[in-house]
Amino acid sequence: MLAIGDVILRAFNFVFLVIALGLTGSLAATTITQHNPQINFAVFAAAFGLLTSSFYGVFAYFVAAFAWPVILFVFDFLNFVFTFAAATAIAAGIRAHSCSNQDYLDDNNIAQGSSGRCRKAQASTAFLYFSTFIFIASAIFSAISLSKGGLFGHSSRPAPRTGVPTMSQV
C-alpha cells in the first residue's frame, strides 16, 4: 500500500500532466511547417507520466500486490528524467522571450510566428516543471518505502519471536 501523501502527490501530478499533455498535444497538432522534436518528446513525457505515475501509482494504492517499491521508484525516476528533459528542451527552444515580439516569433521554430503558440509553449514548460518537482517528491517517497520494505515490499528482517511458547519449549 502506498502512503496517502504519495497518492495526493500523484493526484496533483495527474492534473498537471493532463494540462501539459493538452498544451503540448495542441502544439503538436497545430505545427505548420517545421518539425518540432521538443514538442513530440514533451507529448511522450506527459503521456508516459500519466500512464506510469498516475494510473499505475493509484492502482498500486488500491491493490497492494502491485505496490512494489522498486517498480514505483524506477517509474518515478524515469518520469523525473523525462519531464525534466522535456521541459528543458521546450524552454531552450523558446528561449524565454516576450510573446509579443514579432521578430522573435517569426524566427522561433516552436512559436512559428504565433503568439498563441508561444504562450502555450511557455505554459507547457511551467506545468512540466511542476510535474518534475512532484516526481522528485514521489521518488523520495518510493525510496523511503524501498529502504524500509525491501525491493518487493517485504521486510528483510524476520518477525520477532514473542508470544505463546511452542510445545518444545514447555
Curated annotation (Swiss-Prot):
Any one GO CC term of the record: plasma membrane
Cellular compartment(s): Cell membrane
Pfam families in alphabetical order: MARVEL
GO biological process, one term: protein transport
Residue ranges annotated for the MARVEL domain, each copy included: 6-141
InterPro entries referenced in this protein's UniProt entry, alphabetically: Marvel (IPR008253), NCE102-like (IPR052649)
Keywords from the named record: Cell membrane, Membrane, Protein transport, Transmembrane, Transmembrane helix, Transport, Virulence
Phenotype caused by lack of the gene: Leads to decreased virulence and forms abnormal hyphae in mice. Shows defects in forming hyphae and invading low concentrations of agar but can invade well in higher agar concentrations.
Topological domain spans for side Cytoplasmic: 1-11, 62-76, 147-170
Record keyword Transit peptide present: no
Residue intervals on the Extracellular side: 33-38, 98-125
Membrane spanning residue stretches: 12-32, 39-61, 77-97, 126-146
Membrane topology of this protein: Multi-pass membrane protein
Sequence similarity: Belongs to the NCE102 family.
Main function: Involved in membrane organization. Involved in a novel pathway of export of proteins that lack a cleavable signal sequence. Non-classical export pathway also functions as an alternative clearance/detoxification pathway to eliminate damaged material, when the basic repair pathway is not sufficient. Regulates actin organization and subsequent morphogenesis and pathogenesis.
Protein name listed in UniProt: Non-classical export protein 102
Organism field: Candida albicans (strain SC5314 / ATCC MYA-2876)
Lineage: Eukaryota, Fungi, Dikarya, Ascomycota, Saccharomycotina
